[in-house]
From Swiss-Prot:
Protein name: Serine hydroxymethyltransferase
Binding site for (6S)-5,6,7,8-tetrahydrofolate: 122, 126-128, 355-357
Gene name tied to this protein: glyA
Organism superkingdom: Bacteria
Matching NCBIfam families: PRK00011.1
Reactions that this protein is recorded to catalyse: (6R)-5,10-methylene-5,6,7,8-tetrahydrofolate + glycine + H2O = (6S)-5,6,7,8-tetrahydrofolate + L-serine
Amino acid sequence: MPDNNLEILFQHDPAMAEIIQGELQRQRDHLELIASENFTSEAVLAAQGSVLTNKYAEGLPKKRYYGGCEYIDRAEQLAIDRAKELFGAAHANVQPHSGAQANFAVFLALLSPGDTIMGMDLSHGGHLTHGSPVNVSGKWFKVCHYGVNPDTERLDYDQIRELALKERPKLLICGYSAYPRIIEFDKFRAIADEIGAYLMADIAHIAGLVATGHHPSPISYCDVVTTTTHKTLRGPRGGLILTRDADLGKQFDKAVFPGTQGGPLEHVIAAKGVAFGEALKPQFKAYSGQVIANSRALAAQLMERGFKLVSGGTDNHLMLVDLRSIGMTGKEADRLVSEINITANKNTVPFDPESPFVTSGLRLGSPALTTRGMGESEFKEIGNIIADYLLSRGDEAVKHDCLGRVKSLCDRFPLYPGMKMAALV
């Protein structure tokens, strides 16, 4: 009898199994520095690959449109209860399929087409769903964007207030995809109160840090908080809506179903519940602290090697390297680090002269490799590996050396060591 899922899949669909096995090997052999990626536990994988995928369950626990939901109700309620405990929220909806779906449900609940929303410009570290013209949020609503201060490359709350007073948005959005500093939610609350706006925090990137107290929580300041459940939270890919207002919570529930989704993905919801349970344990708090320590170690090493970082460093899990300091584009740097089995992503920097397809920046993050057990000394070594190869501009001898150093780190900190590779037939 086969004793793991890959062996089962190889028996039934060897073509797909070989692809999945190849991806497992890629994850094992590469240093993952994409700030939005992480490695879930095998317990999360088990829940997501369970028989719960077979069940339709439109509605909410004990309010379903289908029969046979007694175990589904228990699984979803457990996930809800754990999410509320983890973040200190009065209400949680665990059904959004993604962070984008969670954000759109909030828009449906609070806004009408043509209303004004205000969020950070995508090129400064915002997100597509915060009013980018290529996203539905930028097509259905009037959008005004704020950015960072050109001198400090940090949020300028006085400038944000001035823009908010001028534009009077109905919804003010804070929370970002490429901002390496602490967000002061209390200052956003004061601005929202002054203009009578709803305040939404999208903490998709920092949710794990918020849950463990390593970043200030927005729950007591914001009308609604959205997040993904992967990234620093280390769960399955999915979304979550949180609020301290039970009445608003009912509106968000309706906006998710039937407003924007049909049947929830209960196997993913169960996996979210497992991840929330893991995040409630002391080990996860220690992990979150190490994520920040590792990020700062990598940032310090890169700056020591002469690289400029946006805002001069980091307070969280990510950093933005401004490659103009070495005369390189983000596209080129992304290609070069991939040649030595390091995975990152090109990224715009504030006031970037390059297009989004080229960029002047490289975004790096610490969550995934921290999950593998690496600490500050390993992240300093990673900083040196990146610096050595980028500064060499792809020299073959340096490439050979860097590949060996990357392999050494991957071998010392194995990924999913208990997960067997299936025999190719």
